[in-house]
């Protein structure tokens, strides 16, 4: 099938806050003399809903894949059956990513690609004689305004049920009064078939309570989630119902101050943000489901309804996200840890809308560091590889001529002057590395290889006289401080992570048979390690610059210290933890490595306690304060700084649970056919178990203490994979050994301490 020749639109006028332009309907009727199979290619700048003879056939919701159309234009394909006689194609267009004034803080309101929604479509079928026919988007299509008067991807919708056009997409409808569509300029981006998983509704939630307030009726759905609400109401003509979404309450009402945008526009934004508005036509039961937006929320304040209408059945929360397969899981005998695993999964999926976003209620942006930090635990738990591969194309396309990357992808151009740097840009290498490690995928590394080389060269132009780098964001969101007030010096985190990128790039270049590039990357790694050791490590005390948990843990994790130095360096890390009374004191970069370092030195009990303890700051404290998803910030209770209450970039604890507690260590030397089992039998647990579905098959590890305090370990390993079972200090198998070649089976383990 060929890509459609032309894009069409209702007009060039696009929706703004000041001038609402309704979402257009487009339709095309045509005749065939027999039933036939047909293929449809469709894309849109904006979102589309596709109908054939009145039936919605769109794959999922919020189609097509979100991208910068100057870089990439994604299309979808459908197989349909045409009836003999008249057939009707109907398309409903929303503004989507390419016209969202609600994204003004990231310059999406001034994007070069900003335009009215438009679409391109081609339907092909073969007649009885074998001749091919094509129904294509052109000026013969008819268009009319829909009842959707305003739609913004980030903010919400305004829908007027009184303006509905019954049968607009069906056979026999009279569209003679509709105007003809007009041609739209072709986007310049590469046209690609979308292979990422679609977004769709995955669950329906009924409210756990409905409470009358001064402002309306508060619906509480019991969990922080993402999606839309379906409104079912028997309303009066002209009755206007507003749905205001929020993830936390202030004075008993949803409060959106925690997701404020630019203060100079806040009064205007507040009229729209997280609000859907429906006006009733008053002719019986009416059902409204927003089509071209989504929200992050737990609570919905419904205003404009009567007490009789305020029933549980009025509103249903529809959870939406990319349709990612379940690939892993963890559980244990501690309910706090189990709850944190559930919270991590909820944050992961409710922030996965084609690609990992930072949060579903504020930005909905593809922040690069967030994805890099979460890549391992997401690949352990979810089948995200197809979506990651598509997003990597967008990252490569977004790279500028100098080799720099923006902090968000896709972008309108925002994110080069601020919001990037090595910790964020590492996604270019981290994702291909993890995709090879967990899925055996080298195609992603091949796709990114030219961009990786370009990026490494770019970093060499940004080094100071000491070969150090300090060009981006650092250890973001430390406890109790402003997000940018990190203790670990930027030169430390940037240079250490650049060294790690060079190491992983060299590994991938070796796999791709690119020896010159691998040698170049290794030389950079040595250079950056030497610079950190010379200028940012005190070799007398074995303390890293900043004298903080993040610097010390990162220096150990990323092998800045030499083997003979690691014990002394770790002792300093323990001292730093003791100074904080065994609380974590890290931002997101330190949080990614701290607990793994503790486990590597036999301190999994301490790591578990730091994670699950109920007092501030800790993950367990979030639970004590009612969290159902991971939060953006560790702030004390009562703080004015709340931040997002649904962020996934702290979620590597899920990886730690699987790797440290159940012991599943995928690809310990980088190879996807290898797995080690190294469980930590920590004192607070009586059992722990996890699984991961690898390309070869299911991998699992489960252990429990029996009545004699013997630990029974059960391992499940595909026959095509290999590895070892390695016990931590103080434990042996029944034969007295602490190390075995891994095989599926059950093992009895004894303590020797």
Name each model-derived stretch:
Residues 58-70, 253-270, 385-481, 487, ...:
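Helix-terminus loop motifs that line ligand-binding clefts
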Residues 18-20, 221, 365, 422-423, ...:
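Short helix-capping and inter-helix turn/linker motifs at the boundaries of alpha-helical repeat units
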Residues 111, 115-122, 133-167, 192-197, ...:
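Non-catalytic C-terminal accessory modules of carbohydrate-active enzymes
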Residues 159-160, 363, 381, 427-429, ...:
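C-terminal capping/lid segments that line or modulate ligand- or cofactor-binding pockets
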Residues 39-42, 228-247, 292, 303, ...:
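Alpha-helical support elements that line or immediately flank enzyme active sites
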Residues 1-362, 370, 386-389, 406-413, ...:
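Extracellular/oxidizing-compartment recognition motifs
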Residues 47, 138-140, 144-145, 299, ...:
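Active-site acid/base region of carbohydrate-active enzymes
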